[in-house]
């Protein structure tokens, strides 16, 4: 599988993993091209890391309300209308969640030089901020990348689209509790030093234990000392 993905799906000209037609590459960068990192599949070489630069490019996937499902520079971007399950560029939280999981894997498990925690944090901010509709918390099918308007927001099929792994992104990505097979507790928050003075992730069941992860910049929020602290069963 690894060899097939790297040899058949990598578009050398676009420097991106792309989907295939029956006889050729689709020749378009799509968010699904980050899925290989969801499984930590690509080699840990610099050859593939260039694909992540598209996350920060406004002609790539970067939009005012988050990450688009197709590159914005493509001539067919958002050309297929609205309301027909089109995946030609609008923001789908399902796809954004996959990309953010892949991004966290890439930042934690690869010796990369492309992304900083500021990039991940900003995309998480946009992901969270977009999940409102008419002033109330909401997650739906897909939204406009420029206005943030939920494209099927008032229809029943959209408002039950809670399939975006929101909790997992907070726990394993933002707070940074990295799942492992052994009994090591690995925590690597992807939060810039100047953003949050404190956070607490409490009552996390992990390998048969109850974890609490605290960040208290000055030590005056939780009164458990300054900095990052991890408590196991207590």
Q: What spans do the regions from the language model cover?
A:
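An alpha-helical repeat/solenoid feature that recognizes helix-turn-helix modules
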Residues: 27-42
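Short conserved micro-motifs at the rims of enzyme active sites and ligand-binding pockets
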Residues: 47-50, 224-226
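Non-catalytic carbohydrate-binding regions of carbohydrate-active enzymes
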Residues: 1-21, 50-210, 219
